[in-house]
Amino acid sequence: MDRSDSEKTDVLPMFKQEYGRYGRQMLVPEFGISGQLDLRSKRILVVGAGGLGSPAIQYLAGAGIGHITIIDDDTVEESNLHRQTIHAGNVNVPKSESAAEFVGKLNPCISVTPMVVRLSPSNSFSVFEGHDLVLDCTDGPAVRYLINDTAVLSGIPVVSASALKTEGQLSIYNYNGGPCYRCLFPIPPPADAVQTCGDGGIMGPVVGMMGMSQAMEAIKLLTGVYSESFTPFLMLYSAYNFPPWKSVKVRKRQKTCAACGDVPRISRQLIETGQVDYSEFCGSPSQVLLGEEHRITPEEYSKIVSTKHILLDVRERPQFDITSFPRSINIPWSELKHKEELDVQVDGSPVYVVCRYGNDSQNAVDKLQKLGIPSKDIKGGLYAWAKNVDEKFPIY
């Protein structure tokens, strides 16, 4: 930004260009120039530059946050672009660098730092240092607990959101004596019950709404809207409900909380030395459940695909409708797991099972074997088939 003819003075606390850039929001009585000056002096850390981080970063940058740090070790994929519009034209570019590039073009009045690393127990405290607020734009329980614990011990509030399919939720943690994430969720959900956008799907506008809401709540926090009175809440959004928005009160800070309680059991030393094992705490479903004798590679299956056999596709129906093998039979794993017998005549034919990535298909083979039906899992599922056998097969 060329400020040679627009330097700040005692009369003008901002550069002339900033008055023109932020004028419309400074006209809002609840915000004003005092709010703009507040934002101008603040530093925000955004963890995750994906579906939530993409809109949040765009609107925070536009609003004039003084500095934004973006940490994400992932790269942009084509499947991201329907909802992560900040990355347009940047497939295969690190997300944090792509987002920082967008910020630099959108608002040269602020500064931005991209970090192409994964947030971990060994670096979280150094990453958080010097920031006024953290936006949790991640999609996994383990990293959410890490963000929470680091924020509590660093004295930094967190604006956290999530989105899946057509629904989203948002809350503020560790602010003004309110609860932290562990207060509300002391025990993580079962690992097998956790879905990501890649598993369950996501509507772009839904995650966009949640990311923009994070940006708005961040602005309110940083400009003192909640400073006098703050009632902890959980904001819920459901795109196909009417009305789509509702807000509910949540429990207060828990005195017995492991992170922010009266006698906390989590410390910086325990985190940095790996004694708080977030992966173990949250669990992780095993990726290999079956012995090799019960599995077959996509290449091996390609040699028998034209022979007589039964192919069960255990994906959910919407995924099956997107693409499938000819003559495959769809029995979703969510249904098969409860069956006491198979609704398909096997008649001695070999049975093979496929899913999207080769996880549910292993569970299905294990179930079929318990029902007395010999079967084999196709390793890596349809994704591996498209990658290793048929490049024309659509992946999603």
UniProtKB/Swiss-Prot annotation:
Q: Per the UniProt record, which EC number(s) apply here?
A: 2.7.7.-, 2.8.1.-
* Broad class of the protein's primary localization: cytoplasm
- What compartments host this protein? Cytoplasm, Cytosol
As cofactor, the record names: Zn(2+)
One cellular component term from this protein's GO annotations in UniProt = cytosol
Under which pathway is this protein filed? tRNA modification; 5-methoxycarbonylmethyl-2-thiouridine-tRNA biosynthesis
Q: Which PANTHER family match?
A: ADENYLYLTRANSFERASE AND SULFURTRANSFERASE MOCS3, UBIQUITIN-ACTIVATING ENZYME E1
Question: By what name is this protein known?
Answer: Adenylyltransferase and sulfurtransferase UBA4
Which organism was this protein described from?
A: Yarrowia lipolytica (strain CLIB 122 / E 150) (Yeast)
